[in-house]
Design a protein with these regions (language model features):
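Local sequence-structure signature of Cys/Sec-based thiol-disulfide redox active-site neighborhoods
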Residues: 19-38, 42, 46-49
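Thiol/selenol-based redox catalytic cores and closely related redox-interacting motifs
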Residues: 51-133
Length: 133
């Protein structure tokens, strides 16, 4: 239902969806920027959380993992230097240690993550985020 209007950069009024949509966003990531652009083009009001500055807490990460049906390593960027430095490929590390590693080193969290009405999508590819709006 369209019930809110916003002005575009050109000054045009466009309808905005009134639903709670949150994106865990890294403005330096092309996939994250693409996902945010798709949400904006769809007319969705988006709460942007720059997760490198404001990382999610353990409860939030655990909730995201449960909703995506993923294990912690599946939400981690294994190509990041920090992943290797912390030896996070060690299979003896338990779930809590991996989640704590993401909190303390948010660069390890795969992005973007979009949450809408208790549904979660990882924006890989970016178009996947449109499935939940």
């Amino acid at each position: 239902m369209w019930n809110i209007y916003s002005k575009t950069s050109k000054g045009d009024n466009i309808p905005r969806l009134s639903m709670a949509v949150t994106i865990y966003h890294n403005p330096r990531c092309s996939k994250s920027r693409q996902a945010l652009k798709l949400l904006n083009e769809a007319g969705v009001d988006v709460e942007i959380i720059e997760y490198l500055k404001h990382p999610p807490d353990a409860v939030t990460i655990d909730w995201i993992l449960a909703n995506l049906a993923l294990q912690p390593r599946q939400l981690m960027r294994k190509g990041e230097a920090r992943y290797c430095e912390l030896e996070l490929d060690n299979q003896d590390l338990d779930r809590n240690i991996l989640i704590e590693s993401m909190i303390n080193n948010p660069i390890l969290i795969e992005r973007p993550i979009v949450i809408s009405n208790d549904k979660v999508r990882l924006g890989r590819p970016p178009e996947a985020v449109l499935e939940i709006i």
